């Protein structure tokens, strides 16, 4: 997975950026509402949920994959379904970006959802709203919280490959870099920890954590924050010069359930990804107290996660006459 660190900026620039971004979000997100499709496609949420239920019968990973698509979409020019666009003569697909290539998945299920929605309500529900609805349904179906999904997003007319390479947080980045990337889109530290809790289900490839197993940060030794028992298991699964595509569970204890075990894992140094473990192992970080509170109180985590998903879904949506309602999520209309 490619890692591109954002250039360092002085504090005044960062504060100004956050103020500007926050003011934009306040205007855009206010146009989203929970009843947007009540008169035009009242069964939209039920259609999304039933399609995912069907997909789960043959792919237990699909819920985690769908929420990851929403996350990677929102961090690049906002929640506009740009991640779903294929390459064309004029569009460089975000699917080819380092954080997405050979790892982003679930596009076929998005297409199935969109087909079902088009059959019921032609030209009404946007692909960006499909991702938002699919994320809520995926979490709920895995035993996690439900929340009111705000709707009314429209779809982008292009993609941003460079933005996908630079803006999406990487599992091998430092906590400070990831915190900056969250701040750049108007999300705070509580959002960072809560949304990281989505790693309570799903899988990860050896290629995104094998940097911790043998030669961490050029030391010639494994990551010292990695539990020795887990380290031994992972070294066997992902040997040096082995396949980077081998997958394992993000949460070893309850891999397909949405719960707060992810945070307990961090407390015992059983976080799979560097970016996860740093939430608890970075000395003096404010994230430690948040991890501790979520580990001891699942209800608190669920409440925070639901709110943070709403916050993330409010990142720079296209509304009104901006963008379009794609008829096929893979391509802009008329192409």
UniProtKB/Swiss-Prot annotation:
Family: Belongs to the peroxidase family. Classical plant (class III) peroxidase subfamily.
Gene Ontology BP annotations: defense response to nematode; flower development; hydrogen peroxide catabolic process; response to oxidative stress
Misc. remarks from the entry: There are 73 peroxidase genes in A.thaliana.
Location of the active site: 72 (proton acceptor)
Name of the gene this protein is made from: PER53
Positions glycosylated per UniProt: 33, 43, 165, 177, 215, 227, 241, 297
Gene Ontology CC annotation, any one: extracellular region
Any one Pfam family match given in the protein's UniProt record, by short name: peroxidase
Protein name: Peroxidase 53
């Amino acid at each position: 997975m490619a890692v591109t660190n954002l250039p360092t900026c002085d504090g005044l620039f960062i504060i100004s950026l956050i103020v500007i971004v926050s003011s934009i979000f306040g205007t855009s997100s206010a146009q989203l509402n929970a009843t947007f499709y009540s008169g035009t496609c009242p069964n939209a949420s039920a259609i999304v949920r039933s399609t995912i239920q069907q997909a789960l019968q043959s792919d237990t990973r699909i819920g985690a994959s769908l929420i990851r698509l929403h996350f990677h979409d929102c961090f690049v020019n906002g929640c506009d379904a740009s991640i779903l666009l294929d390459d064309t003569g004029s569009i460089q697909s975000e699917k080819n970006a380092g954080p997405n290539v050979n790892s982003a998945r679930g596009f076929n299920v998005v297409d199935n959802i969109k087909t079902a929605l088009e059959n019921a309500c032609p030209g009404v529900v946007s692909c960006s709203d499909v991702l938002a609805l699919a994320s809520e349904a995926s979490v709920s179906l895995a035993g996690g919280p439900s929340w009111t999904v705000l709707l009314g997003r429209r779809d982008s007319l292009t993609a941003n490959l460079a933005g996908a390479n630079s803006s999406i947080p990487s599992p091998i980045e430092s906590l400070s870099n990831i915190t900056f990337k969250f701040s750049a889109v108007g999300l705070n530290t509580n959002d960072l920890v809560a949304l990281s809790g989505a790693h309570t289900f799903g899988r990860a490839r050896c290629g995104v954590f094998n940097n911790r197993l043998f030669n961490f940060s050029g030391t010639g030794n494994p990551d010292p924050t990695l539990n020795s028992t887990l380290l031994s298991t992972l070294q066997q699964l992902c040997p040096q010069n082995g396949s980077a595509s081998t997958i394992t569970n993000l949460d070893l204890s309850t891999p397909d359930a949405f719960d707060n075990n992810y945070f307990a894992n961090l407390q015992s140094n059983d976080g799979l990804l560097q970016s996860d473990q740093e939430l608890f192992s970075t000395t003096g970080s404010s994230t430690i107290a948040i991890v501790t509170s979520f580990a001891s109180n699942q209800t608190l985590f669920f409440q925070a996660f639901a709110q943070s998903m709403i916050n993330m879904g409010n990142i720079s949506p296209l509304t009104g006459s901006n963008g379009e309602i794609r008829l096929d999520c893979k391509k802009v209309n008329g192409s």
